[in-house]
Amino acid sequence: IFAALLTAAVAETFACTNLIVGKNASTDGSTIVSYSADSYGLFGELYHYPAATYPKGTMMDIHEWDTGKYLGQIEQARQTYNVIGNMNEFQVTIGETTFGGRPELVDTLGIIDYGSLIYVGLQRSRTAREAIKVMTELVQEYGYYSSGESFTIADPNEIWIMEMIGQG
């Protein structure tokens, strides 16, 4: 009976896994983060966003990460950093795990979803703390479109967990 219940629970789970090791827990003082999308059908893809300089006033289209739905535009940063996968040129890395939440808490007018928040955050940050600042400022200005997420945000010196859910 236990195995059947466990199988049923796992079959309906759409989650991600982050393993986090801080500097004081690793033998060589490294921070270590791994991230995987555990949901069936979400296979690893390696995205590349090259570093760039943009004229003041340039706008950036935001599309929902999971569906491609157009959500709106945000102001582009004047300078962005090179991002490959979920890490940028300064070794800032961001992963996530979805915890969902009540549907009425999703901001249907928000422009920033969890996936866009990860990659825009990586393009604009030199440290984990700066990524947290960038991410929170983006959702304060443009609204947060997704359900509940737990973000793992790391750099070579520290690792943070930031949870976010919409206000409805």
Which role fits each region the language model picked out?
Residues I1-A4:
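Sec-dependent signal peptide recognition
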